[in-house]
Amino acid sequence: MEFDTIAAISTPPGEGAIAIIRLSGPEAIQIADRIFYAKNSLSEAESHTIHYGHIKEDGEVIEEVMVTVMRAPRTFTREDVVEINAHGGIVSVNRVLQLLLRNGANLAEPGEFTKRAFLNGRIDLSQAEAVMDLIRAKTDRAMGVAIRQMDGNLSRLIRNLRQEILDALAQVEVNIDYPEYDDVEEMTQRMLLEKTELVRASVEQLLQTASQGKILREGLATAIIGRPNVGKSSLLNQLIQEEKAIVTDIAGTTRDIIEEYVNVRGVPLRLIDTAGIRETEDIVEKIGVERSRKALADADFILLVLNQNEELTVEDEALFEAAAGHNYVVVLNKTDLETKLDINRVRELAGENPIVSTSLVNDEGLEALEEAIKALFFAGDIDAGDATYVSNVRHIALLHQALEALNGVTTGIQLGMPVDIVQIDMTRAWDLLGEITGDSVQDELLDQLFNQFCLGK
C-alpha cells in the first residue's frame, strides 16, 4: 500500500527551544531536499543519519536546521521519514511547513502518521490507541500500562485467544465438510465447551482489570463536598500544592466549580472543588450549590469534608445520604481546634468508608489522606511487571460483547444445540476480539479513532 507524502508540525505550537516538522511518504526525502541546503544532498544520505544545513526560500535563508533522514521500512510509518529540527518559533516553523507543502507534500490529518503505521502493519490498532494513552498519561502507572500496550502485551493476548477460537472453528468446519473421514478428530460438544470455557475465563480475567485500567486512563472525577467554610478549597490547594482556590473565613466564598488534575500516590484524580452545599437565598450562590449537587451525583469518588470544631448538622447528615453508593473518604478538618463533632455518629454514618483527620492550616493529615485514597482504589501496587490492563472504553465494550457471544456458545451447548449452530456465536466472538487489534474493523471506525489524535502524530 502506497500513500502520498504528508507533512505536519509534530511539536506543540508556541515558542520553545526546538520545533519538529515531520514528513512521511514516498517523496519525503526528495521534497525535503528541494528546500534544504548543505554540503551533501539528503537524497544520497544513508538511513538514520542527521545533517546540518539551512532551509532557503528563493535564495533567502529562513532557518538553520538539523535534518534526520530515516528510510523505509525501519521507521514508525514504514515509509521514508524526514524530521526537520528547527528553532521553536511560530513564524519560521510555519514558513518551513508552507515551503514543504508548496514543494509537493500534503498537510497531514490528525493522527495520520500513526494511522499509516497501522495500515502498513507496523503496529496494530490497540498499539496505535496506546500511543495516545501514553501522551495523555497523568501518572507513572498510567504511563507503564500504555507502554506495555504499545509493546504488544494486549495484542499478543487477544491474538492467542482468537487463535484458540479459530482452531475450534476450523475443527468444526472439517467435521461438517468431511464427516466421512475417520482420521479427523470429531469436535464434540464437550470438547467445544472446554475450549469455550478457556477463552471465556481469559476474557473475564481481562475485564476484571477494566475498573483499575479505566481509573489510570481517565482519572477519577473527585468531588470535594461539604458545608460552607469547612476547608474544601484549602484541601484542593493542599492536594495540588498551589493556591488555585480562594480561601477566606467568609462562608460561601466558592461560588462555582473549580477543576484540577492531581496525581495522588499513583491515583489520577480530577478534583472538583464545589460550592458549599446549604440552603441560601443568594441567587449566584444558589446556582453554585446546584452545580455542586450535580458534581456530587456524577462523581466517581467523593471527599466529604466536615468541620471537627462544629457539631454535626442536618446538612452534614444529608451529605452522607447523597454520598451513599459512591466510594468516599470522610475528612475531619480543623483538628487544631476544639473537637465538638460527635465522632461516634460520624463513624456510624460513614460505615466502612475511611475517616481521616486533618489540620490543613498546619499541613497535618495529608499523607494519611493520600494513603487512604490509594488503598481504596489500588489494593497493592498495580505496577506489576508484565501485567496487562484494559483501560480503553472501546476495548472494554468489545470484550463485554465477546463474553456475551461466548456465553451464547455455552448456553447453546448446554441446551443440546448442534455444534454447527453454536459456531455462529463462536465466530462472532472471534470477530469482536479482532476489532480490538484491528484485524476486523471498518474504515469509518479507523477515521473516527485516528481523528482523536493530535496533528503531527
Curated annotation (Swiss-Prot):
EC number(s) from the headed UniProt entry: 3.6.-.-
Residues that coordinate or bind GTP: 229-234, 248-254, 273-276
Gene Ontology terms: biological process: tRNA methylation; tRNA wobble uridine modification
UniProt: (6S)-5-formyl-5,6,7,8-tetrahydrofolate binding residues: 22, 83, 122, 457
Domain of life: Bacteria
Entry's localization field: Cytoplasm
Binding site for Mg(2+): 233, 254
Domain (TrmE-type G): residue spans on this chain: 219-378
Gene3D superfamilies registered for this protein in UniProt: P-loop containing nucleotide triphosphate hydrolases, Probable tRNA modification gtpase trme, domain 1, tRNA modification GTPase MnmE domain 2
Cofactor(s) of this protein: K(+)
Residues noted as binding K(+) in the record, renumbered to the chain: 229, 248, 250, 253
Bilayer-crossing regions: none
Cofactor detail note: Binds 1 potassium ion per subunit.
An annotated GO cellular component: cytosol
SUPFAM superfamilies for the chain: P-loop containing nucleoside triphosphate hydrolases (SSF52540), TrmE connector domain (SSF116878)
Gene Ontology terms, MF aspect: GTP binding; GTPase activity; metal ion binding
Keywords, alphabetical: Cytoplasm, GTP-binding, Hydrolase, Magnesium, Metal-binding, Nucleotide-binding, Potassium, tRNA processing
Function: Exhibits a very high intrinsic GTPase hydrolysis rate. Involved in the addition of a carboxymethylaminomethyl (cmnm) group at the wobble position (U34) of certain tRNAs, forming tRNA-cmnm(5)s(2)U34.
Subunit and partners: Homodimer. Heterotetramer of two MnmE and two MnmG subunits.
Family: Belongs to the TRAFAC class TrmE-Era-EngA-EngB-Septin-like GTPase superfamily. TrmE GTPase family.
NCBIfam families named among the record's database cross-references: mnmE_trmE_thdF, PRK05291.1-3, small_GTP
Official protein name in the record: tRNA modification GTPase MnmE
UniProt source species: Listeria innocua serovar 6a (strain ATCC BAA-680 / CLIP 11262)
Lineage of the organism: Bacteria, Bacillati, Bacillota, Bacilli, Bacillales
Name of the gene this protein is made from: mnmE
